[in-house]
A protein has these predicted regions:
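Pseudouridine synthases involved in rRNA/tRNA modification
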Residues: 1-10, 17-23, 156-236
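Short Gly/Pro-enriched turn/cap motifs at secondary-structure boundaries
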Residues: 53-54, 119-121, 181-184
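Glycine- and acidic-residue-rich catalytic/RNA-contacting loop of pseudouridine synthases
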Residues: 20-34, 38, 74, 92-139, ...
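Residue-level signal for inorganic ion chemistry
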Residues: 15, 64, 90, 129, ...
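A short alpha->loop->secondary-structure connector
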Residues: 28-32, 79-86
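Glycine/acidic-rich beta-strand-loop module
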Residues: 46-81
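Short, solvent-exposed secondary-structure boundary/capping segments
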Residues: 137-143, 215
Length: 236
């Protein structure tokens, strides 16, 4: 379900596998948070574990957990003030209406647990993105969210006509989503960058699950994106 990437006295960074629920679903103790907590507490380095952000079930990649209440409060403030830089990778098989830029708008509940992007801007979801051509008419997206809305990145790409491959909600009409080749939802939490108690931290984690994430074309592309914060991002 996960592997530990890094630990300090105040927090732990893990790599979440794809198709793993963050919370318990059905069986108590079966969710990701419960499993991480069980593992970290068994090491005897802390007495409690606190979630500070989350990933959807289909999404793999980097997650941070606080190891004490003070750290949890600090991280809560960092996320609230958007001082944790988050970068994601996604693959779509549909030509987008625009290849880079800004996706911005309020989000509202739709049908079947879905959300939709609105044209209003009262409390908008904000996402910057670049995209890169890949083989087999696929397109790689590097995404930088500036808000933390439910399904934000999935809705953002769907709104420009490029739903994420394997997304069970937003890619129902995608060219290849229903074919056996699709072995996961292709969204991955790739990088985190933040300052905590005066020290700077950077974490980069390329995906290691999914056939499309293992292709030579994909590997060549992300070699050029190993410091995503250095790119000339579209204006907010």
């Amino acid at each position: 379900m996960f592997k530990v990437i890094s630990q300090t006295n105040d927090f732990v960074v893990i790599a979440k596998n794809a198709d793993v629920n963050f919370h318990d679903e059905g069986t108590p103790g079966s969710g990701l948070f419960s499993k991480v907590k069980e593992y970290i507490l068994s090491e005897g380095n802390c007495q409690e574990l606190y979630p500070v952000h989350r990933l959807d079930k289909m999404t793999s990649g980097l997650l941070v957990f606080a190891k004490n209440s003070i750290s949890a409060k600090i991280f809560g403030e960092l996320f609230e003030k958007h001082q944790v830089e988050k970068y994601y990778l996604a693959i779509s098989d549909t030509k987008p209406t625009k290849k880079q830029g800004l996706i911005k708008g309020d989000m509202a509940k739709s049908r079947r647990g879905m959300f939709k992007l609105m044209r209003t801007m009262e409390n908008p979801a904000i996402t910057q993105f670049f995209s890169y051509s890949m083989e087999n008419k696929q397109r790689l997206y590097l995404l930088k969210p500036h808000s933390g809305k439910t399904h934000q990145l999935r809705v953002a790409l769907s709104s420009i006509g490029a739903p994420i491959i394997g997304d069970p909600l937003y890619a129902s009409n995608s060219n290849i989503t229903s074919k056996p080749l699709v072995d996961r939802g292709y969204l991955h939490a790739y990088a985190l960058r933040f300052e905590f108690l005066g020290e700077s931290y950077e974490f980069i984690l390329p995906p290691d699950e999914g056939a499309f994430f293992q292709s030579d074309c994909f590997t060549d592309r992300i070699e050029q994106l190993n410091k995503p914060w250095l790119l000339n991002w579209p204006k907010l």
